[in-house]
C-alpha cells in the first residue's frame, strides 16, 4: 500500500524451533517490534501469534524458525519508518540468542 515499507532479513537458527513436542524445553524466541502498523511473515507465511499487542508495539512470540536460514519480512507503515525498533529476545534460554545469526541478504544465494 502507499508508503508502507518492508524490512527483509534472514535469521539463522542452529536448531528447529517449530516443534514443541520433540523438545519441551526448546528456546522460545520472541520478536519485539515498535511500530504502529506492522505485519510479520516468516518464510513467506503470515505470523500472528503474539504475547503483547499494543497501539505502538507488538511482541511476536515463539517464532517457529526452522533449522538453518529463515526469511523474515516485517511490513511497516509509512509513518513508522523513522521510529521503528525491533529486536529478538529469548526468555527461557539466555544462551540461545548469541547462537542466532542475521543477514540482510539471502546468505544462500551468495
Question: Predicted segments — roles?
Answer:
Residues 3-5, 27-29, 36-40, 82-84, ...:
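Short beta-strand/loop motifs in extracellular/secreted proteins, especially
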Residues 1-25, 110:
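Extended carbohydrate-recognition surfaces in non-catalytic/accessory domains of CAZymes
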Residues 61-110:
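An acidic-aromatic loop/edge-strand motif
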Residues 17-41, 72:
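Aromatic-lined ligand-binding clefts that engage carbohydrates, nucleic acids, or primary amines
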Residues 35, 39-61:
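Solvent-exposed beta-strand/loop surfaces of large extracellular or lumenal domains
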